[in-house]
């Protein structure tokens, strides 16, 4: 104990030692107090930070309203005390003042600021460029604070612009309400139309089902129609072959009629001569009775006339005339047969189209309109062949009453022959002439009458033969057309047959398509049901929307809500009132550590005052002084922070206790280093201080530090002092504080034990050195 008292006596009696120790008592206060006072609440005085605003905005028009966002911002800033606002129109001068550190921030509002705000509804809207200029090289913190001011300005401008947009939007809500009302009416019409469509869809579904069944029947009937068309084609081909034979017969008739025409012409000529001779004979007959007396003299004359009549009759070539009459009979029979064949042919042509129509009309599964369309389709496939006008041909042919009376002609010819025979006998009967005068006169009369009939018959024969020849010629022309038409009919019927087979294929496709249509119509009917439900709901919702939109009554409070809808609330678990409070754990720990290092400079840590009895007494004679200095340092700095600067803590007495524990732990570390190693130990203590400045986590979170600092973070004593101070000052987590205090006490005990060990070794060494001279 003598050593301890001697140590305090030396301090009190030595001003060179006492005054420095007293000064050391205030080192933590000077370090911590001065620093914390200077930066206790720098953000609370940013209203003194000079910032200049350069407004170059020219304004714009949006939806009929004048936009002056730049001017509005300037007016708002003039009523804002967050910064020391200055306003200018000269950008170049403001930038020069920034370089000269007159301002820490230059805010530039460009000339198109409001104009860009009016492009919000354009295809390519432009953002509002709020430019700012800082000079971080002159003062980084000032530039950083200025950037935070820009964030606030950005929020303010965004709010102002949004309010302008919101006003325009709400002004248009009435138009929107009207449009929604109109849309509701339109949706109602859509709903009504959808109902009609739903009903039509049901009918369509039903009819398509019928169509599906009918198309199968159509396919079967079309196959039958195709077979019938093939049979018609075969019949037409037979008809065409028969027409060829008819044409050959017609040519033969034409040749015979030409021969008959030649014979009838010759007959007419000879009959003229006969009639003239008979007329001469007839003229002489009245005088026959009167000239009986002159008969003898006239016999010669009568014989000559008889010879002349005989020549005329011989010249007639009655054989040819009979042949012509027989040919005429044959022609009449051929003409009758020919007329019958023409009539049959005409009927076959007329029945051609009817055959197709009968097949189609016989279908009981087609409607009248479908039958008409199918008949038109078939008729388009048939070539339009103009059949010859058979009625005209038949009218031009001579009828039976127009031909000469063949029986009469034959009878007259027989009479002529008989009379000629009598005339031939005239020379021989001259002697009997007188007795038969009456008979001769009657015979001549009959001969004349018969000759007239023959003449008239030959005239009719000639006229009839002429008409017959012309009719047959016309018939040949029309028959040629009929033959050509039959050939076209053959071609057309083949095309129709081919078309019907295509129609058969098409009907099968129609059958397949109608089946798909029937299936699709079912889906359509289901979809229309869903659509009907949706259109009804759409109409109702649009009406509700129109009513609700029309009821909107916006005011400034509404505009403000849209412009700034979010209100932030800082519900901190443990709040820190200012910047200085947040830095106190870090700065206070450094002050106490620096105070310990300064003490080792003015207070001798090794030289004993008197003779210590052992190493512990030697250690404690030094440590009790350092412990008292540490406690006083802690009390002074803690009291000034609490009462002088205004530090607020969660527990005052715990704050005092933890400050003392921290100071004693740091002193124990520094004592060991300085005692055992002298100045190199002090240097190591300074190195530890420097490492703790970066690695203890006093400013930025540990996760933001480089990896090396994160590794050594747990080995540094300030790490635990800072965490403990945060717990007692801000968090109120006293359990965590005592945990950190336990770590510091453990470090202090280890350092004290090492120091005691060193002093014990040193004390033994001193004792050994004293004993050696004595011996």
Swiss-Prot record:
GO molecular function, one term: ABC-type transporter activity
Entry annotated with the keyword DNA damage: no
InterPro entries: ABC2_TM (IPR013525), Phage_infect_YhgE_C (IPR017501), Phage_infect_YhgE_N (IPR017500), T7SS_ABC-Transporter (IPR051328), xxxLxxG_rpt (IPR023908)
Keyword entries, A-Z: Cell membrane, Membrane, Transmembrane, Transmembrane helix
Keyword Transmembrane helix assigned: yes
Pfam families: ABC2_membrane_3
Gene3D superfamilies: abc type-2 transporter like domain, Methyl-accepting chemotaxis protein
Major location category of this protein: membrane
Coiled coil: none
Transmembrane regions listed in the UniProt entry: 16-36, 585-605, 625-645, 655-675, 742-762
Any one of the GO CC terms: plasma membrane
Lipid bilayer topology: Multi-pass membrane protein
Localization of this protein: Cell membrane
Sequence similarity: To L.lactis phage infection protein (PIP).
Official protein name in the record: Uncharacterized protein YhgE
Taxonomic lineage of the native organism: Bacteria, Bacillati, Bacillota, Bacilli, Bacillales
